[in-house]
Curated annotation (Swiss-Prot):
Disulfide bonds: none annotated. This is 4-hydroxy-2-oxovalerate aldolase 1. GO terms for molecular function: 2-isopropylmalate synthase activity; 4-hydroxy-2-oxovalerate aldolase activity; manganese ion binding. It is an enzyme of class 4 (lyase). It comes from Rhodococcus opacus (strain B4). Belongs to the 4-hydroxy-2-oxovalerate aldolase family. It catalyses: (S)-4-hydroxy-2-oxopentanoate = acetaldehyde + pyruvate. GO terms for biological process: catabolic process; L-leucine biosynthetic process. It holds the Pfam family DmpG_comm. Its EC number is 4.1.3.39. Transmembrane segments: none annotated. Keywords: Aromatic hydrocarbons catabolism, Lyase, Manganese, Metal-binding. The lineage of its organism: Bacteria, Bacillati, Actinomycetota, Actinomycetes, Mycobacteriales. Residues 4-256 form the Pyruvate carboxyltransferase domain. Mn(2+) binds at D13, H195, H197. The gene is cmtG.
Length: 340
């Protein structure tokens, strides 16, 4: 089979788990460990991508540029990657990231809004970058519709398009259906990627199913460090890949050491499946909403799960973090709310 392309997202999606607060020194140390462990690419940015630091999404302890520079200084083999959401990051941020050594970028949109990625994908291609389309909250639209959005990103110039399970809501059949729908419509030369979350404890299983269906790019992170219950834990996925004799180039023990020695000590809240993060997956809520919902719960005395259930019912998507407070206030005003 084709060698897998292992992309680590500890220092981008994982930013949500530490409220986007990490020192450049820690970034450099983690990047050096990942590079030595043989991963193919390392993504670095605010959790919401370039220029994501704000009152709405959460300010970062440092700028994207400070983190990216620290990463670039510690890379030898892996490709430096970042993420950009059109409407948050701009062409100017894309160009600056390229100047600092970023050579691969994922352009992320909501799963039904691929058309807003055209400019950014085209610019990244113009700069000679490796470009992926990143269709977030992929559970929110049927497989065939998602594949049509992937086809748009391909037409703009994306080398790869991801099934991005931002809510950790997809089951194995959901992943299988979406990857097959992609393969049916995309050109044979266009790669497919999987970005899984652990909210339903299915991130490794979903990633394995994706690979079995032809996916070659797999997102994962040290200790699963990421939004909600975290991403696919890279050390667990690599262990399973070894059992399947899949080619990948990563060192299992080195990844285990980095996960336990470097990343877990940074977590102010354990990244795991618990009553709150399981509810994210069950209700199909954007994983990065967890910390915002926990803050609203503390401020207004409403169970986090009740808030998350209502977020899921209303179908909130990335960028609507401010509405979580509105939901909490509505719940306070309406009195006791039953759970399901």
């Amino acid at each position: 089979m084709t060698k897998l392309y292992i992309q680590d997202v500890t220092l981008r999606d994982g930013m949500h788990a530490v409220r986007h607060r990490i020192t450049p020194d820690d970034v450099g140390t983690i990047v050096a460990a990942l590079d030595a462990a043989g991963v193919d690419a390392i993504e670095v940015a605010h959790g919401d991508g370039l220029a994501g630091g704000s009152l709405n999404y959460g300010p970062g302890s440092n700028t994207d540029w400070e983190w990216i520079e620290a990463a670039a200084d510690n890379l030898t083999h892996a490709t430096l990657t970042t993420l950009l959401l059109p409407g948050i990051g701009t062409i100017a941020e894309l160009e600056q990231a390229h100047k600092l050594g970023v050579r691969s970028i994922r352009i992320a949109t909501h799963c039904t809004e691929a058309d807003v990625s055209a400019q950014h994908i085209a610019k990244a291609r113009e700069l000679g970058m490796d470009v992926s389309g990143f269709l977030m909250m992929s559970h929110m639209t049927p497989a065939e519709n998602l594949a049509e959005q992937a086809k748009l990103m391909e037409s703009y110039g994306a080398h790869c398009v991801y099934v991005t399970d931002s809510g950790g809501r997809l089951t194995m059949n959901g992943v299988r259906d979406r990857v097959r729908a992609y393969r049916d419509i995309l050109d044979p030369g266009t790669q497919i990627g999987i970005h899984a979350h652990e909210n339903l404890s299915l991130s490794v299983a979903n990633s394995v199913v994706a690979v079995e269906e032809g996916v070659t790019r797999v997102d994962a992170s040290l200790a699963g460090h990421g939004a909600g219950a975290g991403n696919c834990p890279i050390e667990a996925f690599i262990a399973v890949a070894n059992l399947h004799d899949w080619q990948h180039g990563s060192d299992l023990f080195a990844l285990q050491d980095a996960a336990d020695d470097l990343v877990r000590p940074l977590q102010d809240r354990p990244v795991r499946v618990d009553r709150e993060t399981l509810t994210l997956g069950y209700a199909g809520v954007y994983s990065s909403f967890l910390r915002h919902a926990e803050t609203a719960s503390k401020n207004y005395g409403i169970d986090v799960r009740t808030i998350l259930q209502e977020v899921g019912k209303r179908g909130l998507v990335g960028g609507q973090e401010d509405m979580i407070t509105d939901i909490a206030l509505d719940l306070v005003a309406s009195g006791p709310v039953s759970t399901y």
